[in-house]
A protein has these predicted regions:
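Disulfide-stabilized extracellular recognition modules
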Residues: 15, 71-117
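Short, surface-exposed glycine/acidic/tryptophan-bearing loops
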Residues: 32-79, 93
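A short alpha-helix/helix-coil micro-patch that ends at or immediately precedes a cysteine
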Residues: 2-44, 59
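Surface-exposed patches in mature extracellular/periplasmic domains of secreted proteins
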Residues: 19-33, 46-56, 90-105
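Soluble non-cytosolic domains of exported or imported proteins
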Residues: 3-8, 25-33, 51, 70-78, ...
Length: 117
């Protein structure tokens, strides 16, 4: 996985936003680190839920906060298609208030953390 996966996923996210005339996400290194920690936690705990999501934003400057989680894919395009086909996840990707993203991946779990000021 690693950086190629994340670069590809950010490109897909930004392409989807461009399709509806939204500005692209800025990749936030702090959110990325927290998304990676969250993905590792979910993987190691064998969980797949949004419980505890707000802890990932503790101390962050973001007014708007959101999380997408996907499971079962290790390919960026497959993850993106899965999330775009889910109304709630799609809403996060296309939420105008979000301007920053961080992505983490562990096992077959992908975490996208979104922030907006």
């Amino acid at each position: 996985m690693g950086s190629n996966f994340i670069v590809a996923l950010v490109m897909l996210l930004n392409a989807s936003r461009a399709d509806v005339q939204l500005r692209p996400f800025h990749e936030d290194p702090t959110l990325s680190g927290r998304a990676q920690q969250r993905a590792e936690f979910l993987c190691n705990a064998r969980r797949f839920d949004h419980d505890g999501m707000m802890a990932a934003f503790e101390g962050s400057p973001y007014r708007w906060k959101g999380e997408n989680i996907a499971k079962g894919h290790r390919d960026a395009k497959a993850v993106h298609v899965q999330l775009m086909n889910s109304p709630g996840h799609r809403a996060n990707i296309l939420k105008p208030q979000f301007d920053s993203v961080g992505i983490g991946q562990a096992c077959d779990i992908t975490v996208e953390l979104f922030g907006g000021r």
